[in-house]
Amino acid sequence: MISEFSYLNITSIGRNLIQEENDCGYACLEIPSCFSYNVAAFPDVNGKLLCELLPSDKYNNSDTFNASQEFHHFYIPVSQTTYLSQLFHWKDNK
């Protein structure tokens, strides 16, 4: 799921520059301790998006979940299968 223009401000377990938002989702799925991620809302001058992999989610850190003009926050709603389905549905409807 996505919380557009939101940012979970916790210490990341990894940061990458990516081409597309779903690249960050794939990276998160490869790390068992990744539960959510922030992706830059807009690309940098080289067309890349910053991806921040996070070890927790907005439900366990609601005090550090904030509005942002620079990021979108993605989190796993129920299961990884549901998550991927919703991620691709959102991407297709952009």
Task: Tell where the protein language model's regions lie, with residue ranges.
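Extracellular disulfide-rich cysteine clusters
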Residues: 1-94
